[in-house]
């Protein structure tokens, strides 16, 4: 399994979070895609034990508003 930032496949942006470290929102969102654990790191949700078949940030098809 990999680890990485949770990505919104429609925008290419990370899932934003403000409460760093232990973060219920990130834990829930990471578990939703089948990851083992999540926390807020650098204002984005970081997932551990990320399923290999799920996309993570950066998402090649979408640039999150950057050119």
From Swiss-Prot:
Signal peptide: 1
Domain of life: Eukaryota
Segments forming a coiled coil: none
Matching InterPro entries: LCN-type_CS_alpha_beta_dom, Scorpion_toxin-like, Scorpion_toxin-like_sf, Scorpion_toxinL, Scorpion_toxinL/defensin
Disulfide bond sites: 13-64, 17-40, 26-45, 30-47
CDD domains assigned: neurotoxins_LC_scorpion (cd23106)
Cellular localization per UniProt: Secreted
Alphabetical keyword list: Amidation, Disulfide bond, Ion channel impairing toxin, Neurotoxin, Secreted, Signal, Toxin, Voltage-gated sodium channel impairing toxin
Any GO MF annotation of the entry: toxin activity
Pfam families, sorted: Toxin_3
Propeptide residue intervals: 65-67
Tissue/organ expression: Expressed by the venom gland.
Statement: the UniProt record of this protein carries the keyword Secreted: yes
LCN-type CS-alpha/beta domain segment(s): 2-65
Sequence positions bearing Cysteine amide: 64
One annotated GO biological process: defense response
Gene Ontology terms: cellular component: extracellular region
Domain comment, as recorded: Has the structural arrangement of an alpha-helix connected to antiparallel beta-sheets by disulfide bonds (CS-alpha/beta).
Role played: Beta toxins bind voltage-independently at site-4 of sodium channels (Nav) and shift the voltage of activation toward more negative potentials thereby affecting sodium channel activation and promoting spontaneous and repetitive firing.
Family of the protein in this entry: Belongs to the long (4 C-C) scorpion toxin superfamily. Sodium channel inhibitor family. Beta subfamily.
UniProt protein name: Toxin Cex8
Protein's organism: Centruroides exilicauda
């Amino acid at each position: 399994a990999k680890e990485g930032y949770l990505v919104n496949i429609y925008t290419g942006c990370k899932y934003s979070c403000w409460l760093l470290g232990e973060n219920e929102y990130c834990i829930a969102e990471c578990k939703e895609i089948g990851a083992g654990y999540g926390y807020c790191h650098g204002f984005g949700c970081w997932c551990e034990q990320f399923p290999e078949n799920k996309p993570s940030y950066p998402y090649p098809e979408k640039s999150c508003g950057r050119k």
